[in-house]
Regions:
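Hydrophobic alpha-helical signal peptides and transmembrane signal-/tail-anchor segments
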Residues: 5-23
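Short, Lys/Arg-enriched N-terminal segments with co-localized hydrophobic residues
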Residues: 22, 26-39
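A cross-family phosphate/adenosyl-ligand binding-site feature
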Residues: 42, 53-125
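Alpha-helix C-terminal capping segments
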Residues: 117-123, 150-161
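Glycine/threonine-rich flexible loop motifs
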Residues: 137-146
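Glycine-rich phosphate/pyrophosphate-binding loops
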Residues: 156-178
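Electrostatically charged, flexible surface regions
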Residues: 177-296
Length: 296
């Protein structure tokens, strides 16, 4: 069964593949007092690939809250931004996470994975999309590059609540990362979202400092901070003397202003930034309407 490949013609507006019995979904669960309630259905994705340890930690943290469906890229799409694949077909195959959890892997981008699920690849209604856990912070303008964040953005475009979760280890950390704190915080955020809901065009960008949970000072709701990029153009020559280029440089820094995501993490706090899809520069709107646009 695991070698079955689903062929998804790109550009279809609606399509449906019946995956039963691959990912059975319980429709009714029970509260602690024995009353029936509807079980929520969460789609989990990421940009590091379906085999990434951060995704596994997230799935394990959320598995007792809701029915979980995993649909993630089959390889790393870090810094891919918001992608919609329109000029080639997308393929999806069944796989297993390291703990044996069934999952689906696509050769599309993170935002493609969310679109596939919402447009019919997953039969059951999805209530929430959670993307992560990314092994690096997504702070300030990082959100425009991040496949983790733009997967959540894709859900918000379709009117679904969504959460992107990233861990922010300091530069130079060696060896496998410990995702336990970030996974626990992700669960806490998801519990609040399931309880309160989110406005239709809003999603959350969550960043967690690389600290034991006991050392986390708290949770702050923040605005985006100012990220400072130190990119460099690196020129190389191939064996035939033809130039090629890498975009490289040092890791970005940020301005830890009070009330920002960067400032929160610098102070040992979890940052939760509500984000929306309207990129209009509201402060400039009326001013620019007063310009002499019709002047000869």
């Amino acid at each position: 069964m695991l070698n079955k490949v689903l062929f998804v013609p790109s550009g279809f507006i609606r399509f449906l593949f019946v995956l039963t019995p691959f990912l059975p979904v319980k429709e009714i669960g029970y509260t602690n007092d024995g009353k029936e309630r509807l079980v929520m259905h969460i789609l989990v994705t990421n940009d590091d690939g379906v085999s990434a340890p951060g995704l596994l930690a997230l799935v394990q943290a959320l598995s007792s809250l809701a029915t979980i469906t995993v649909l993630a890229p089959d390889h790393n799409w870090s810094a891919s931004g918001h992608v919609k694949t329109l000029h080639r077909p997308l393929r999806v195959k069944e796989t297993l996470l390291a703990d044996g959890t069934p999952a689906l892997a696509s050769d599309g981008a993170p935002s493609d994975c969310v679109a596939l699920a919402m447009m019919g690849l997953i039969e059951e209604r999805i209530d929430l999309v959670v993307s992560g856990i990314n092994p690096n912070g997504n702070l300030g303008h990082d959100v425009t590059y991040s496949g983790t964040v733009t997967a959540a953005m894709e859900a918000a475009i379709a009117g679904l609540p969504a959460v992107a979760v990233s861990l922010d280890p300091p530069e130079g950390v060696m060896g496998p990362l410990d995702y336990s704190t970030a996974a626990g915080m992700a669960r806490r955020v998801v519990e609040q979202v399931l309880h309160h809901g989110l406005p239709k065009d809003v999603f959350l960008n969550v960043n967690v400092p690389y600290l034991p949970e006991a050392e986390i000072k708290g949770i702050m709701v923040t605005r985006m901070g100012l990220r400072i990029y130190r990119d460099a153009l690196i020129k190389r020559l191939d064996p035939r003397g033809r130039p090629y280029y890498w975009i490289g440089g040092d890791m970005p820094t940020g301005v830890p202003d009070e009330g920002t995501d960067i400032g929160a993490l610098a102070g040992g706090y979890v940052s939760i930034t509500p984000m929306h899809l309207d990129l209009t520069a509201q402060t400039e709107l009326e001013k620019m309407r007063g310009w002499a646009w019709d002047a000869d």
